[in-house]
Amino acid sequence: MSSAPPGPAAPRLCCMEKGPDGYGFHLHGEKGKPGQYIRLVEAGSPAERSGLRAGDRLLEVDGTNVERESHQQVVERIRAAAGAVRLLVVQPQPEEQPPKTHSDPDGEAQREPPAAETPAAERSGPEERELRPRLCRIKKGPNGYGFNLHSEKSRPGQYVRAVDPDSPAEAAGLRAQDRIVEVNGTSVEGKQHADVVAAIKAGGDETKLLVVGVLADEFFKKCRVVPSEAHLAGPLPEPMANGDVEKENGGEPRLNSVSERPPSPALATSPEGSETHSEPDTQEGDKRSSAPSSLLDLDIPLAVAKERAHQKRTSKRAPQMDWSKKNELFSNL
């Protein structure tokens, strides 16, 4: 005699108090489908200790049914709880389980969280997501990876200039204007164009790129922090406001300014000797550093002062570019 199929699982009430890093779970909603699901429960978190499990479907928040509420409404309910929350959940039947892979309208890789996913209700959804770096794993196709890498004179770094439609790069979530931070786990901050291209090619038929979009790039620069894989899902840094005082390596405090940047060479060249980009800010740095000495020469004749200024400007001027090598600034990969 065959046994009857098991009935639906009983709902469970999970009571948790917010810890220093939040509740410790990720809430996930499918576009066009009702219901909110627990996608991930962090080890050792208040959520794990309360009995919350990945895959649970959320029924109630503090006694209020949320099965028909939108993702953002549920997130706001959890955030409104004063340091503690009670979640009524149920482990769904196998046919109810949400798919484990996702894609969004931007064509981002399955490794990216979907637009309706919020870590422990601590974030504000899409806005916070745009501030995070993205990890794009790309397998080379018949026509290569399908993106164009370039550098600019006006700003340091290597940027994605274009992504071919239906290419491996597009499928992996790479976007135009992305800045390359790491190639195959190695930082390329401050590297020259040719070095970054070589690092990508060294990966053979597959490469792993950590990138930041325009908003994320601006955010991390304000925070004065180099993005890393730790920022894919971990806590984000806090931006530093102008006038904040910071101590470095136990030394004297210094005044932070958003416009300050690490020192960089005025002209970066590839091994072949072609120009990749120049950094105008270093000229400003030269002016600042030379200011004290110029104050000592106030009594020199005006004609001599003009001649010295002209010599300084011409000495800092970058050599003219060999336009026959311009293609080395733009590399199709």
Curated annotation (Swiss-Prot):
Residues 112-122 have a biased composition (Low complexity). Residues 90-164, 232-333 are annotated as: Disordered. GO terms for cellular component: apical plasma membrane; cell periphery; cytoplasm; endomembrane system; filopodium; microvillus; microvillus membrane; ruffle. GO terms for molecular function: chloride channel regulator activity; protein-membrane adaptor activity; signaling receptor binding. It comes from the Eukaryota. InterPro entries: EBP50_C (IPR015098), NHER (IPR051067), NHERF-1/NHERF-2 (IPR017300), PDZ (IPR001478), PDZ_sf (IPR036034). The keyword Cell membrane does not apply. The keyword Membrane applies. It holds the Pfam family PDZ. Keywords: Cell projection, Membrane, Repeat, Wnt signaling pathway. Residues 97-111, 124-133, 274-289, 323-333 have a biased composition (Basic and acidic residues). GO terms for biological process: bile acid secretion; glutathione transport; negative regulation of cell motility; negative regulation of phosphatidylinositol 3-kinase/protein kinase B signal transduction; negative regulation of platelet-derived growth factor receptor signaling pathway; protein localization to plasma membrane; regulation of protein kinase activity; renal absorption. Residues 13-93, 135-215 form the PDZ domain. It is a peripheral membrane protein. Its main location: membrane. It is found in: Endomembrane system; Cell projection, Filopodium; Cell projection, Ruffle; Cell projection, Microvillus. Scaffold protein that connects plasma membrane proteins with members of the ezrin/moesin/radixin family and thereby helps to link them to the actin cytoskeleton and to regulate their surface expression. Was first known to play a role in the regulation of the activity and subcellular location of SLC9A3. May enhance Wnt signaling. This is Na(+)/H(+) exchange regulatory cofactor NHE-RF1. The lineage of its organism: Eukaryota, Metazoa, Chordata, Craniata, Vertebrata. The gene is NHERF1.
